[in-house]
Amino acid sequence: MIQWFLKYRPRSLKDVENQDGAKKELQEWIESWLNGKPNAKAVLLHGPPGVGKTTLAEALAHDYNLELLEMNASDSRKLQDIKSVAEKASVYGSIFGTRGKLILLDEVDGINVREDTGAIQGILELIEKTKYPLIMTANDPWNPALRELRNKTKMVGLNKLGKYPLRRLLKKICQAEKIICDDEALNYIIDTSEGDARYAINMLQGIGEGYGKVTLDLVEAMARRKERELDPFETLRDIFWARYAWQAKNAATSAQIDYDMLIRWISENIPIQYDNIEDVWRAFDALSRASIFLKRAKGGDWDLLSYAYDLMSSGVAAAEIEKKKPNWKPKWKKYQFPSYIQLLSKSKDIRDTRDEIIKKLAIHSSFNKTLNDTYPFFLIFYKKYDKRLSLNTKEKEYLNSASKS
């Protein structure tokens, strides 16, 4: 099952509505590149979610016969990630017989500058060295972390999709998918979407596929549900209890946690939710396939992310055969945190205790030198000096354990 917002996205610039100014700026920019005199090496394409930033970049590549290399900056964020994927592409030629390449870095405002050290610097270096045009997208271009990028790029803003173009698009989809949508429901979707075409299309698909008809009552119920993100426990319950694919998919896409962590949560709790061993097998089979699609998506083919979400949500939900029976009722189970998180937490606690001890030792030496040269010997005879170091109970317990291992 492909998401409708991907299925019906414009393939050419002429099909992109309500963005005439942005289209003109992008065309002038790309033509300056093709003529060998770029007026800017990179463009920062910005606008609210769902207005078509990625779609516009893809349509530009299509119309000018450019090979598009797409990379999600908020998932491949460290300096080495940026360099290894994007920089190589900027140096080597295309193998597809196109006129050249267009590099797309999606969601640069999703970069966490504290955790992803060097990512912004990596992008700045890429802008300086690239031999091909570079487009970046951002919902919030005024993020302080993007200041240097703003100074090095041509900024192009996108408008929200107007009500009339959005209405035409939704009616076209209803006709193509043979979905009946009441006028009141259509108006409600358009009003609540606030120009976010992806949100509107996803809502239309979620209800249309589940019920075959889109009514105001159903739309209002879904809109209330999507006003807040679901915590992991709510997400699991909605996925495992879902009887329809769209219900499970909505739960997954409304989760507070990202797709990597969601897979860990689902994996940990499949054996808890499903009693039948065959149901467990089918659920893990769907989850393993989701992991494969997710890995391929991270390799640059982000359209595959939709399939990963389908499998980790709808695929897992459909694993329980008993759901097909009319009298089926969901079983309440007590879900648990992934053991992976618990191990990480325990490991961090151990490292923190060790580091506090090393800080006490490293009075006349650096931390790293003490860790590598002094600490291994200290474990052997630490009991002679524990009082002088003012070790607390937790640190003593750690040293007792470490000296035995």
Curated annotation (Swiss-Prot):
SMART domains: AAA. ATP binds at residues 47-54. Keywords: ATP-binding, DNA replication, Nucleotide-binding. InterPro entries: AAA+_ATPase, ATPase_AAA_core, P-loop_NTPase, Rep_factor-C_lsu, RFC_lid. GO terms for molecular function: ATP binding; ATP hydrolysis activity; DNA clamp loader activity. It comes from the Archaea. GO terms for biological process: DNA replication. Belongs to the activator 1 small subunits family. RfcL subfamily. Heteromultimer composed of small subunits (RfcS) and large subunits (RfcL). Part of the RFC clamp loader complex which loads the PCNA sliding clamp onto DNA. NCBIfam families: PRK04195.1-1 (NF003226), PRK04195.1-5 (NF003229). This is Replication factor C large subunit. It comes from Saccharolobus islandicus (strain M.14.25 / Kamchatka #1) (Sulfolobus islandicus). The lineage of its organism: Archaea, Thermoproteota, Thermoprotei, Sulfolobales, Sulfolobaceae.
